[in-house]
Each structure stands twice: as structure tokens, then as C-alpha cells.
């Protein structure tokens, strides 16, 4: 599922320079880190604003190559990593993060928020985000449960 029909707000200022293969820490928090890409970065930042206990929010603009150093450092300094993607959780961003951490022997709890290997349905983008639990409200609720 891709909801590219929605306009995505710019999360960077005019001085930002894209660096291929490098992720960016957009908000610094503790205990929980949210790693997202694309539209899900915007929803993750909205969830950040709704939460009292602030998570770290990381934008991973490229999945291949992925920023291994940032992911490893994040896993070492947080209790839980939550990946958020408008994609099947199998073979997506969450899997890529797991593939970075497993060979390093880093034991960090991970939760993958995304499509659970189901056929997508049609609808308005915001309604689909809500239906699949990918909007800021659902991200916030998941973080509180962790």
C-alpha cells in the first residue's frame, strides 16, 4: 500500500542537504525510537507532539543503502525501536532494520507498524491511514502501550 496521493509536508528547513544513504534524527527523545520513511515521517512527528514521554523520531529517506550506523547507535541507546511504514511489514523498513541489528548481535525490542500481509483496500488516504492504524493517533497509542 502506498498513499502517495496525500501531500507530504516538508520536515526539513531550506538549508537541509540530502545525503544518499544517511538517516536524520528529527526529534531527540528517550526509551522509544520511531524510524519511518516518506509520509510516515510526517505522521510520526504528529504522534511525537501528542505524546508526553517523547520518542526519538528518525527519517530514513533511503532503504537501500540504509544508514546502518544510525540504526545501530539508536538500538544501543533506546529500549524499543518502532518502525512505521505504509507498506507490508514483511520485506520493508522494519525488516531492513532487523537485518542491520541481527548480525551485530544487538538485542533491542522492535515493533513493526505497517500492513500485516493483507490485501489492501481502496479508500480515501486519510481513512486508510486510520483503518490500518498508521495515523498519528494510532502511532501514539502504540507508543503508550510499549
Feature map (PLM): residue ranges:
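Active-site donor-nucleotide binding/catalytic segment of nucleotide-sugar enzymes
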Residues: 1
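Thiamine diphosphate
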Residues: 4-146
